[in-house]
Amino acid sequence: MAIKDYIRERFFPHIWCPGCGHGTVLNSLLRAVSQLGMSKNEIVVVSGIGCSSRISGYVDFHTLHTLHGRALAFATGVKLSRPELNLIVPMGDGDALAIGGNHFIHAARRNIDLTAIVMNNRIYGMTGGQYSPLSGHGILATTAPYTNIDYAFDTVKLATAAGASFVARGTTYHVQQLAKILKQAILHEGFSVVEVLTQCPTYFGRKNRLGTAADMMEQYKNNTTPIGSKAKQENPDLIERGVFVQKEIPEYCSEYDKIIERAMKGN
């Protein structure tokens, strides 16, 4: 199917600001789905609240637009009741790791077959530019006018430590790599986490004087490197991108079905 066949054109134009990276993430996701040849009826997109969560309204799949931070909880329920469906959960950095942080670590621990896309623009964009758990030390935000003193989570390390069986990172600059990673994540049986570094030129960019959206994307080009590269050895401050974890361990829903079968047999 063509990419346009996967969207609800009646809801366009979208609400995202000019230069926002979320449209690039959506495009990469739809290209991944298209390349996999997936039917619209075998995909469920579950989102919470925030700029990133508007994706569920734009895609012509089964969709749920749920509560702030609870997308993974809703997605867990859908997956347990309809395990044959492919669950994709786009979340913002606050949605996933602030109010939704508890659900995130337990979904990873259980290894539920969901694809969690953490769209990290380092800010709460929809509600006015407050800092998030991924904003980082020293940045400016509406709730940190004299700089933020919190240090950021490392999403990759957090997901890995919590037990996710697929963990990756991409950026809105490296779109071909991002689409490839998303394909791998969707095909993986288990909890997949894909962090996407995506720009918010309106709140994060202006507040921190980072220039235009193109300037911010240029930073992803210059400040990231493939996993294990020589550049990383020479400059430890570079952010690695690629697939960090990909392992096969028992998937939660499959194991749960075994328990149900045992219970019905009475042993």
Regions found by a protein language model. Give the residues of each.
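Flexible, low-complexity linker and terminal segments
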Residues: M1, F11-F12, Q199-N267
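Active-site diphosphate/adenylate-binding microenvironment
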Residues: A2-L67
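Conserved thiamine diphosphate
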Residues: I3-K4, P133-Q184
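Short coil/turn connectors at secondary-structure junctions
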Residues: F12, S39-I43, S81-L87, R109-T115, ...
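Short catalytic-loop micro-motif centered on adjacent basic/acidic residues
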Residues: W16-P18, V89-M91, F166-T171, V193
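Glycine-rich beta-alpha junction loops
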Residues: I49-C51, N121-I123, H174, L197-Y203, ...
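Thiamine diphosphate
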Residues: I49-G125
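Active-site-proximal loop->helix
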Residues: G101-H106, M126-G138, L158
